[in-house]
């Protein structure tokens, strides 16, 4: 197979770290770019969202809305590669699209002329048509589903263009990164700890004066550097030719990699003319003005040819070799690492492959050789210019099948070889050994592993793929969770999740859970969304559930516990540290993972505990944010009232409208406290009842106790503000304050007494647990996940029930509480999805990502997956089916209007003022951190 096909099959798809997937369409007559993403159907099953199709052509900068006929016909070409800016700590929101001619277009997800929006909308930032850059920012409209007269025609070509881009790289910023080395078991307490390094930026990275930058190399040997200064929207370009020799005018392939030198790229090319490899060093001087930060200067490029070598014709044992693949891998973030050069050969007459691994090293020529040339050795002995690069042969790797492509993965810590027989082999960059484990299914009990370097080292691997001839393109998902591929016979991609061959040995569950936790922490530190890893973990949970329900739940608890351990999160510290922990993105991601792993289990508490925790955290942030804004508006109003022509109404209205927007969340919290009290009534009357045990987990878990106390504290703070600063000029606006008081007054449970009850539990709980030596790292995952008290802590259960009976229930109207409605809680997984798709759509062994053909005919659209009668972020019952713009979360499936303008009929008064409510925080991301996308309402 020719390398041109190998490169196009690998780079024809790009999966962003935020979850968007871009791939080329080589057949359609009305578009060449597809954008899709994985979305949950029912909490456990997923599907690829119907792709939006776009036309990327060289004339995008022209007026797209013009209906006039252009002077010359417009054509679009096949796309050769696409690249999200996933490198390092970049945000993954920019997409570079390169067509076969060499035109390069940069698109931005979630950005438009009117500001930020949902990520499923694209805008063009700039386009390079080889000879000219067009810096016109414009929205990119998707191709209509029914358009009989496309304005742009597809133009196929069989030619190879000299301007084709062979390799492309995004350049990272100067933020330091965290490199995870391994999860190491601490034998004193049998807990895995995270071994990590805080690494400074390495390789090539741009300074703060540059907003974004990228680099590419073309077939004709030209290097292009695009960059955007932080004070402008326009992009600039610097071009540089490798050499003026004819051999660099027609390159067969090229690679760009970061080196161990600061601000230096290693460029490797293979000339189709000279039939040899050439290597260059490219140094980038960003030309930062250190004396005047406001003055920006263009970067400077310095290119140096360092080596030329020819490919091997014979193998180590005299085999005839044919050059087949070439890959240069960047150095890793860890100090002391170097770029690696991999040259792949087919062994002629066989199906086997040989990969020769090299490193570029500096060496001093032999002095005897120099003296034979008549050079003065004494003059050259201390001259550093004598140092020359050479390729040091390090290792030969042999494979029993032809290599389809080579991909560096896991932040370049792993190298993945996809073979023609459908299998994958992954090598660790630090050991260059196969990163896998030969699992013995007969080994029962006593299994242990002290070091986990990656999930593949614990026995997980990618499944066998379909025949290579049936695959159009294939790539590894960003967080290692599986393989995305496009079959030639199917219109949409397919996802193959990681799988584990050994399931019958329960002693391996801890190691397997820690392996998932290690990858979760690794990629969460690099701002990955991680839905692919969640699907792989959920697949493993279902396979365990077939063997034992208890093992499946224990596995989830082990995953959550391992994540907390690897993050170093302890809940026994001071209250201030606990508050910061609960506000962190890591805790938010942990709640989401538990929700995803806990859906469709027999133990409903796993999902409900995570959802309740996430909801309490969201309400706490909303209360805190509104209180701070209300306090600021009170100060604004005081200033405006002192002015002769001040507009006090707008500030007063905005303040009261913010308060009004909190009322649904207050109603939810009141219902939640009522629900917990109802469960306490049931348990006090029947202590052996396990169907109402969620309250035990809520009261035992320190995170939920603390969050409930924080919400009550914020409510008291809000009531204090509206009592101390009522509206005197526009008294009608006080209605929202009255509604808030009424929502609290309608609670059948006295919230002040409930607060006292929680504080007393906090005070007595620690002494009860400390008496039995239970550590938070052991007990918290059990409380957080299982919502149950272990048998060893049975005295804690007895205390909770007896104390609840005397301290709370004895002072409560039990009949009023017991018959109160709590229908608006929606804390169970099936309540978030339409009944037609709420159950599993196919057996888990067939995969959790389903085709559209599996879905019921009436539930093919995304708007039919979740009920459209409830806004899960604002906690408000509202018929959203009639609204023009609503959003859905790809992870938890909630539907919301967050981030959109508030309708006049949903404010305290009809007014032309458009307020910015607290829900505007969730214009792009859901409260669970999932991606929000706009629904096509029926």
From Swiss-Prot:
Pfam families: Med16_C, Med16_N
Example of a GO MF term: RNA polymerase II-specific DNA-binding transcription factor binding
Cellular localisation: Nucleus
UniProt entry keywords in alphabetical sequence: Activator, Nucleus, Transcription, Transcription regulation
InterPro entries recorded: Mediator_Med16 (IPR048338), Mediator_Med16_C (IPR048339), Mediator_Med16_N (IPR021665)
Major place of residence: nucleus
UniProt keyword annotation of Transcription present: yes
GO biological process, one term: positive regulation of transcription initiation by RNA polymerase II
Superkingdom of the organism of origin: Eukaryota
A cellular component term, taken from the record's GO annotations: core mediator complex
Family, per entry: Belongs to the Mediator complex subunit 16 family.
Known role: Component of the Mediator complex, a coactivator involved in the regulated transcription of nearly all RNA polymerase II-dependent genes. Mediator functions as a bridge to convey information from gene-specific regulatory proteins to the basal RNA polymerase II transcription machinery. Mediator is recruited to promoters by direct interactions with regulatory proteins and serves as a scaffold for the assembly of a functional preinitiation complex with RNA polymerase II and the general transcription factors.
PANTHER family: MEDIATOR OF RNA POLYMERASE II TRANSCRIPTION SUBUNIT 16, THYROID HORMONE RECEPTOR-ASSOCIATED PROTEIN-RELATED
Oligomeric and partner information: Component of the Mediator complex.
Descriptive protein name: Mediator of RNA polymerase II transcription subunit 16
């Amino acid at each position: 197979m020719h390398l041109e096909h190998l490169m196009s099959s690998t780079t024809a798809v790009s999966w962003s770290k935020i979850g968007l997937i871009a791939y080329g369409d080589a057949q359609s007559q009305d578009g060449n770019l597809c954008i899709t993403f994985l979305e949950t159907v029912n909490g456990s099953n997923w599907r690829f969202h119907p792709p939006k199709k776009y036309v990327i052509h060289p004339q995008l900068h022209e007026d797209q809305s013009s209906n006039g006929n252009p002077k010359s016909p417009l054509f679009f070409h096949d796309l050769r590669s696409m690249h999200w800016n996933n490198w390092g700590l970049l945000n993954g929101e920019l997409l570079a699209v390169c067509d076969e001619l060499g035109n390069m277009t940069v698109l931005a997800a979630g950005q438009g002329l009117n500001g930020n929006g949902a990520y499923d909308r694209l805008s063009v930032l700039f386009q390079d048509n080889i000879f000219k850059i067009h810096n016109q920012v414009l929205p990119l409209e998707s191709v209509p589903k029914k358009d009989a007269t496309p304005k742009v025609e597809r133009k196929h070509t069989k030619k190879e263009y000299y301007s084709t881009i062979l390799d492309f790289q995004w350049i990272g910023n100067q933020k330091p990164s965290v490199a995870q080395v391994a999860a190491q078991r601490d034998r004193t307490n049998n807990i895995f700890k995270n071994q990590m390094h805080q690494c400074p930026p390495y390789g090539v990275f741009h300074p703060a004066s540059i907003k974004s930058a990228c680099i590419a190399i073309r077939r004709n040997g030209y290097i292009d550097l695009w960059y955007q200064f932080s004070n402008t929207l326009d992009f600039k370009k610097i071009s540089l030719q490798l050499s003026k020799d004819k051999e660099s005018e027609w390159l067969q392939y090229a690679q760009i990699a970061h080196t161990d030198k600061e601000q230096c790229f290693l460029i490797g090319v293979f000339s189709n003319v000279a039939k040899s490899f050439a290597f260059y060093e490219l140094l980038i001087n960003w030309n930062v003005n250190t004396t005047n930060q406001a003055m920006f200067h263009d970067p400077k490029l310095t290119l140096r040819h360092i080596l030329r070598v020819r490919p091997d014709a014979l193998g180590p044992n005299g085999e005839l070799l044919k050059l087949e693949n070439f890959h240069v891998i960047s150095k890793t973030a860890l100090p002391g690492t170097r770029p690696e050069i991999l040259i792949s050969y087919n062994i002629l007459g066989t199906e086997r492959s040989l990969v020769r691994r090299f490193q570029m090293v500096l060496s001093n020529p032999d002095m005897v050789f120099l003296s034979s040339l008549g050079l003065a050795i004494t003059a050259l002995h201390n001259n550093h210019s004598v140092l020359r690069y050479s390729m040091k042969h390090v290792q030969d790797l042999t494979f029993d099948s032809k290599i389809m492509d080579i991909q560096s993965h896991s932040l370049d810590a792993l190298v993945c070889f996809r073979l023609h027989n459908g299998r994958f082999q992954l090598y660790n960059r630090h050991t260059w050994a196969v990163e896998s484990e030969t699992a013995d299914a007969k080994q029962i009990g006593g299994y242990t592993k002290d070091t986990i370097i990656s999930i593949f080292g614990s026995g997980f691997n990618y499944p066998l793929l379909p025949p290579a001839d049936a695959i159009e393109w294939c790539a590894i998902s960003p967080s290692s969770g599986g393989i995305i591929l496009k079959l030639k016979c199917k219109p949409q991609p397919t996802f193959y999740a990681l799988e584990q061959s050994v399931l019958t040995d329960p002693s391996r569950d801890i190691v397997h859970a820690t392996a998932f936790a290690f990858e979760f922490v690794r990629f969460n530190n690099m701002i990955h969304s991680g839905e692919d890893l969640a699907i792989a973990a959920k697949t493993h949970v279902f396979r365990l559930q077939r063997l034992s329900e208890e093992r499946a739940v224990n596995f989830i608890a082990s995953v959550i516990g391992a994540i907390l351990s690897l993050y170093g999160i302890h809940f026994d510290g001071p209250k201030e540290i606990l508050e910061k922990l609960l506000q962190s993105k890591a805790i938010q991601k942990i709640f989401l993972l538990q929700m995803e792993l806990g859906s469709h289990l027999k133990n409903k508490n796993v999902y409900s505990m995570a959802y309740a925790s996430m909801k309490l955290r969201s309400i706490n942030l909303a209360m805190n944010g509104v209180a701070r804004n209300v306090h600021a508006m009170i100060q604004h109003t005081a200033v405006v009232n002192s002015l002769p022509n001040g507009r006090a109404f707008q500030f007063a209205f905005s303040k009261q409208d913010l308060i009004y927007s909190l009322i649904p969340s207050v109603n939810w919290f009141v219902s939640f406290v009522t629900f917990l009290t109802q469960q306490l009534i049931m348990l006090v009357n029947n202590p052996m009842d396990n169907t109402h045990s969620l309250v035990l987990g809520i009261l035992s878990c320190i995170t939920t106790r603390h969050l409930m106390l924080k919400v009550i504290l914020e409510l008291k703070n809000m009531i204090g503000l509206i009592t101390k600063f009522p509206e005197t000029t526009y008294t009608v606006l006080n209605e929202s304050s009255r509604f808030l008081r009424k929502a609290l007054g309608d609670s059948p449970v006295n919230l002040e007494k409930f607060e006292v009850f929680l504080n007393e539990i906090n005070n007595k709980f620690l002494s009860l647990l400390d008496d039995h030596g239970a550590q938070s790292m052991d007990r918290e995952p059990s409380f957080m996940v299982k919502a149950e008290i272990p048998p060893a802590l049975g005295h804690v259960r007895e205390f909770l029930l007896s104390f609840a009976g005397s301290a709370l229930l004895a002072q409560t109207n039990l009949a009023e509480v017991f018959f109160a409605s709590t229908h608006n809680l929606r804390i169970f997984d099936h309540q978030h999805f339409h009944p037609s798709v709420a159950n599993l759509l196919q057996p888990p062994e067939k995969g959790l990502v389903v085709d559209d053909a599996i879905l019921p005919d009436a539930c093919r659209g995304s708007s039919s997956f979740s009920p459209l009668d409830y806004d899960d972020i604002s906690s408000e019952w509202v018929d959203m089916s009639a609204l023009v713009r609503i959003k859905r979360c790809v992870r938890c499936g909630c539907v919301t209007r967050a981030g959109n303008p508030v309708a006049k009929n949903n404010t305290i008064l009809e007014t032309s003022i458009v307020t910015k409510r607290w829900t505007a925080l969730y214009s792009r991301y859901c409260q669970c951190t999932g991606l929000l996308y706009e629904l096509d309402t029926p």
